[in-house]
Design a protein with these regions (language model features):
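A conditional alpha-helix N-cap/helix-loop micro-motif detector
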Residues: 24, 87, 111, 138, ...
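Short glycine/proline- and acidic residue-enriched helix-loop micro-motifs
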Residues: 71-81
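Active-site beta->alpha loop and helix N-cap motifs at the rims of alpha/beta catalytic domains
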Residues: 79-86, 90, 109-110
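Small/aliphatic-rich secondary-structure junction motif
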Residues: 2-72, 164-228, 234-235, 245, ...
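A short, well-structured beta->alpha microelement
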Residues: 110-117, 223-239
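Gly/Ser-rich helix-loop-strand patches that form or flank binding pockets
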Residues: 4, 10, 24, 28-30, ...
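Short, flexible loop segments at the rims of nucleotide/cofactor-binding pockets, characterized by
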Residues: 105-108, 134-137, 175, 223-228
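A structural motif corresponding to the C-terminal end of an alpha-helix
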Residues: 89-105, 219
């Protein structure tokens, strides 16, 4: 049973971007499950890509039919129809997922730059969940996800498939304000917690562990601790790879990054990662 605590970082609105790709549908299912557990509102958004619409208006753009493999001119009317159909499929998927999870939900269709529209929607949510790869299906972070992560939104969770989202939480703590928010987020999500203590030496690690333990003791919570002394994200990724189910809660400016960009660091993980920025 989840420990009930008062937390100003409580997650009340969970945003998911839906484009009907397998990865976005997996993100939707995960978001619905989490919304049900946290009694949060599920917010879905589908973005009609303005760049595709402008491209279709050009007289020299061709497309290849999926079934016929024949080349034909890409027409604006056909593009509009395809976008409407995709939005309808996204809305249907949203309704089904919300119904199964029995959560409050809203769904909107926006038109514009995908990154700009999603960042605007994310600014009004407490947590943004998106699939790692989009339509490509590759394990590496997709182009849209990379841009959104680099933009530094509040809290963003990257998932690869339909993972269960309340297993062990591995939150990274280094004493910074961001790591304190990461710890608050872990507290709001669940009681099965591990804390990765990031430190320059063992004395600092002991002090930081005592700091976290004091916070958790006040809330009646316990945690397992792992020290990451002079470590990097690759070492953390290898550590959690041995866990059957794990979500890493990672501060966006963690010392573990060691000069890597966030997208580069995220490519090292095989489990869901929740960024706190």
């Amino acid at each position: 049973m989840r420990q009930k605590v008062s937390n100003p970082d409580k997650i009340r609105r969970i945003l998911v971007a839906i484009d009907a790709s397998p990865q976005s549908l997996a993100a939707l299912e995960a978001a619905a499950e989490l919304a049900a557990d946290l009694d949060a509102e599920l917010v879905g958004v589908y973005v009609e890509d303005i760049n595709l619409i402008r491209l279709a208006a050009l007289p020299v753009v061709l497309e290849t039919g999926e079934a016929s493999a024949q080349t034909r001119r890409l027409e604006s009317s056909r593009m509009d129809r395809q976008l409407r159909n995709q939005a309808a499929r996204a809305a249907q998927a949203m309704a089904l997922a919300a119904s199964r999870a029995q959560v409050r939900w809203t769904f909107t269709v926006a038109r514009g730059s995908i990154e700009a529209e999603l960042l605007h929607a994310a600014s009004e949510a407490d947590l943004f969940i998106l699939g790692r790869a989009g339509w490509s299906g590759k394990r590496r972070l997709g182009s849209t996800a990379r841009k959104l992560v680099a933009a530094g939104n509040n809290r963003t969770m990257i998932i690869e498939r339909g993972e269960r989202l309340l297993p062990t939480l591995m939150t990274v703590y280094d004493g910074s304000d961001q790591s304190k928010r990461a710890l608050d987020t872990a507290i709001s999500l669940g009681e099965y917690m591990a804390v990765g203590i990031v430190a320059e030496d063992e004395d600092q690690a002991k002090a930081l562990q005592s700091e976290v333990a004091a916070i958790l003791d006040l809330l009646g919570l316990k945690a397992r601790y792992r020290w990451l002394v002079r470590a990097d994200t690759r070492e953390l990724a290898n550590m959690v790879r041995t866990q059957e189910e794990c979500i890493v809660i990672l501060p966006g400016e963690s010392p573990l990054l060691e000069g890597k960009s966030l997208p580069e660091a995220l490519d090292e993980f095989e489990c869901p990662v929740l960024l706190v920025q």
